[in-house]
Amino acid sequence: MASTSKNAQRAAASVAHSYHVCLARRMSRLPTLLSNISAPAASKALDRYESKRIHSRSFSSSLAAQRVQRPTSAGPILTNPISDHEKDNDELRSLFDAPPTSSSANHLRSSGPSTGLFEIPSLTSPQNFLVLAQQTLARAQLLVDRIDRAGSADASTAQGIKELKEVVRNLDRLSDLLCGVIDMAELVRNAHPDPEWAEAANAAYEYLCGYMNVLNTHTGLYSVLKNILSIKEVAETLSKEATAVAQVFLRDFEKSGIHLPPAERERFVQLSDEILVLGRGFLQDIAGNDASDDFARIASAQADADKSDMVGLPTHWLEDVNPTILKAVRASAITDTDGLLTFSAADQPWVFQTLLKYAPDERARKVAFRAANYGSQAQVQRLERLLKARAELATLTGASSYAEMALGDKMAKEPQNVEEFLRALTKHHRPRASHDLDKLRRLKHNATVSEPAQNTRQSTFNTNSTLPEFAPWDRDMYTEQHFRSASLSNVQPLSPYLSVGSVFAGLSRLFSALYGIRFRASMVAPGEVWSEGAGDVMKVEVLDESEGARGTSGSAEGLIGTIYADLWSREGKPGGAAHYTVRCSRRVDKDDEAGDFTYGRAEDGRVVRPQDLGGEGCGNPLQAPTFEQRERPGRYQLPVVVLMCDFARPGNANQGPCLLGWHEVETLFHEMGHAIHSMIGRTSYHNVSGTRCATDFVELPSILMEHFVSSPQVVHLLARHHSTGASLPFEHLSSHLAASKSLEGLDTYHQILLARLDQLYHSQLAASPSFSSTTTYSDLDRQMHLPGAPNLSYTEGAHPQVRFGHLFGYGSTYYSYLLDRVIASKVWNHLFANNPLDRYAGQVFKNQCLKYGGGKDPWHILADVLNEDSVRQGDSRAMQQVGKWGIEC
């Protein structure tokens, strides 16, 4: 018998449950004024894969895969292939497949003094980060005062009208000013290997976020914004994009409770703070870390008093477990005496997840399932207090539920529309889920034909009497057996054909074919990137054949943005994948910086001169470069994004490149969907640039990329054997995709259940004194039963809801991923299924969807892209229609 230390137990718990935690940064702007900090639009890999498998008990570990189309004998056709482009693609492949091992070997790393992080001259040392934040705040105060004073401007004078017309642009400038530092600090505090830099970035982040929280309750800014939208002479001069920006700010103000009377506004702030603390504790519990609030102290005292998390397993239930697995399980037991093993449900979840997969005795799996879904009374109480606090917050704003409050600026608009969508989607996918379930029931039948009768019990839910009833604790084991079956386990590996460099070069070829956009490796200046080891961070220019900055790319193309690729795992770096937006597109030549100093004042009322803040023309302390554009008038700052992954770094040339698994290729394509959205969505206003759009729309471009990667025509562009150069055989891809999607219907059905649970938890139910999150889960689980499975993911005594981390980060919007999966399937079939490399189809999607960022109603975008006017209104009928489309599996 061996007992692991408390820290080791917690570490194991953290690993086992890490995919439950909402690690992803929000996919769009934060729901408060000016807080649309462009934290990574896509969520780390969790938001793609875990949204399908949020529980370890999910029906399958299969990956999303789409219909395979056999390529024509002619192979894919590239639009105007150019030899220079292929040279650049070859350089990309070489750069990522064999990154330099020393600075002297890196021809893309220049020498000389530091140019500053992201080539910001002032950021040459961590000490300067807070100084930059302070300069930014001082500059922001001038803008705030100027906007506030515009509210008292005389609208009957030319100057008064001029100032009022500048309000939306000035608010957007203010947002860009603050987010430019906050977004960068968010990246640096997470990714920089030097603790000094990380701490300095965190200090700057918290400093400016604190100021932003003050702005969220600035009644002067709210009043002047509301006022200009009611002045016809001003409102009529706003472009559609500017109007969209104004509406975003207005909604975010009101979601912050700014329109409430003082006493109610104070309560709003109190509740918001409480929700934040509760949410952090909720996620810390899931991660296996110790929360520090009152609920954590109650839970600790309860566990010490009654040992409620202790689980006993008779050893004779484990006799048929693989000896190697059993040895590891027994070694982890807290006690092993008299034929009984004891474990901690709170600290050793990996034990129970292992037994759910590999314990043939159903009694052991049933105990393991309940333990894997263990939730202390205090954890349940914390979640329910979180949901009730949200319900009270919504009531303060005049909404009937938190979902109603949160969905006003989403595609769904209101909870009833989400329910229409999910109801239609449930009906569409139920037959497919039942079909997949029967595959697992047959495996159970084959395994239990000689077992005692209690293992093959029947019920009124079992419409196929020849197959045994399926319990929640059966899922993991028979899913594991399903994928180990002869027909699926013999699938040929794809990794030898999928080196990081080949995939990156293939992405460049794909975007060139579709959008006339490609990648080119670029020189990295000293001090420009956060991890300066040779080859740690690569810089990639994004070029457009007909648009972009004049005369910057050294070719006939124009520069439209920059991607920094931080792909290799290193100590201290966050796991998973993420897309960070460091800088957004914005038109700058119309900025009236001089007017800030004329009309604005410091917070203490002082007149401020440009030289007081660093010199003449000090508009933005970041001093971001700006460029004239070939396709439109004006000067723009260009988007800068960071693509972060944790792939294994290649060794020396003899060891070969980093070879990716299929799910890692999907991850790269998914995150690149966000990146290309940022590159193409170069709007005139920061606040609607790129991925700054509705939460339930932002995943469309990235999910669509998953369709591309499973197309043979596209795979032909990127899959080459790393040593022979041979193309990936079609039959290898076909068999892999068939295997990976073989239980997709069941996975999707379970995700629908979680989306419906999220809606119930954020409905009026949460405000009821008798509300029980466990009862609500149990009732929904029974309601959504499948033939032969009276319960999908619940059994008495379990509390699976306390493992559903997305309840905090995506409260009432968990349906978003499902909605965008449906839309992506429809767009794929409408535009790309017949020819994934068609330039005309690519231009339609580029010009009717991607280029608008968040500046156009997503329903109008969808109607235009699909030629489906029936969904243009985005009402309940539109949501119901989208639900009926279903997700192609």
UniProtKB/Swiss-Prot annotation:
Q: Which Gene3D superfamilies match?
A: Collagenase (Catalytic Domain), Neurolysin, domain 3
Enzyme superclass (EC) = hydrolase
Q: Which UniProt keywords apply?
A: Hydrolase, Metal-binding, Metalloprotease, Mitochondrion, Protease, Transit peptide, Zinc
The cross-references to InterPro entries, in alphabetical order and at most eight, read: M3A_MIP (IPR033851), MetalloPept_cat_dom_sf (IPR024079), Neurolysin/TOP_dom2 (IPR024077), Pept_M3A_M3B (IPR045090), Pept_M3A_M3B_dom (IPR001567)
Biased amino acid composition, Basic and acidic residues: 83-94
User: Which Pfam families does this chain map to?
Assistant: Peptidase_M3
GO molecular function per UniProt:
metal ion binding; metalloendopeptidase activity
PANTHER family listed in its UniProt record: MITOCHONDRIAL INTERMEDIATE PEPTIDASE, PROTEASE M3 THIMET OLIGOPEPTIDASE-RELATED
UniProt lists the family membership as follows: Belongs to the peptidase M3 family.
GO cellular component terms, A-Z: mitochondrial matrix; mitochondrion
Composition skew (Polar residues), residue ranges: 100-112
**Cofactors named for this entry:** Zn(2+)
Region described as Disordered: spans on this chain: 60-112
Protein's UniProt keywords contain Ribonucleoprotein: no
Q: Which CDD domains match?
A: M3A_MIP (cd06457)
Q: What is this protein called?
A: Mitochondrial intermediate peptidase
GN (gene name): OCT1
| Record text on cofactor binding | Binds 1 zinc ion.
Give the EC number.
3.4.24.59
Could you tell me the Gene Ontology terms of the biological process aspect for this record? Answer: peptide metabolic process; protein processing involved in protein targeting to mitochondrion
Assign the protein's first listed, main location to one coarse class: mitochondrion
Keyword Transit peptide on entry: yes
Biological role: Cleaves proteins, imported into the mitochondrion, to their mature size. While most mitochondrial precursor proteins are processed to the mature form in one step by mitochondrial processing peptidase (MPP), the sequential cleavage by MIP of an octapeptide after initial processing by MPP is a required step for a subgroup of nuclear-encoded precursor proteins destined for the matrix or the inner membrane.
Q: Which residues bind Zn(2+)?
A: H670, H674, H677
Recorded superkingdom: Eukaryota
Q: Where in the cell is it found?
A: Mitochondrion matrix
